Amino acid sequence: MNLKEAEEKMQKAIEATKNSFNTVRTGRANASLLDRVMVEYYGSPTQLKSMANIGIPDASTITIQPYDKTSLGLIEKAINMSDVGLTPNNDGSIIRLNIPALTAERRQEMVKKTAKLAEEGKVSIRNIRRDAVDSIRKQEKNSDISKDESRDLQDKVQKKTDKYIAKIDELLAAKEKDMTTV
């Protein structure tokens, strides 16, 4: 693994962390809250967003209008079974999800969940660093590169690691600020 590959993988880890942050409730309506909701549709799990139009009419409401009206009950069941923590209101053609204001206790739970997701992102980046350093050491052992080049490359990998971990910390701080602001 070279430095460029390691950096690309670290960038992907950042994107994955951002996406996982988007699934955490902040007290505002956001279509990405439903990204992980899978609906059992004709025997196979299907992403909700691929079988319905998801709208945000106001800051505290999400509307779900399925392309196939017969799937309303299945969507409602999938939302109830998911860990979204919202109760669907089915009016026969549209499902509405009202987003209640988060209590201080619930906000703290969400902050902890976000911190855990950030830590998973950091671990992922550290694993990429470990793989890159192992690859560099292997090249040094095989005499493909000198000891000085090896040390230089390992330092560069560490600097990239520090940069991307700092980026995750920035994302976490911004998300926590978003969640704790009422």
From Swiss-Prot:
Annotated keywords: Cytoplasm, Protein biosynthesis
GO MF annotation: an example: ribosomal large subunit binding
Record carries keyword 4Fe-4S: no
Pfam families (UniProt xref): RRF
Alphabetical list of InterPro entries matching this protein: Ribosome_recyc_fac (IPR002661), Ribosome_recyc_fac_dom (IPR023584), RRF_sf (IPR036191)
Domain of life assignment: Bacteria
Compartments where found: Cytoplasm
UniProt xrefs under CDD domains: RRF
NCBIfam families cross-referenced by the UniProt entry: frr (TIGR00496)
Function, in words: Responsible for the release of ribosomes from messenger RNA at the termination of protein biosynthesis. May increase the efficiency of translation by recycling ribosomes from one round of translation to another.
Family as reported in the entry's similarity comment: Belongs to the RRF family.
Protein's UniProt name: Ribosome-recycling factor
Gene that encodes the chain: frr
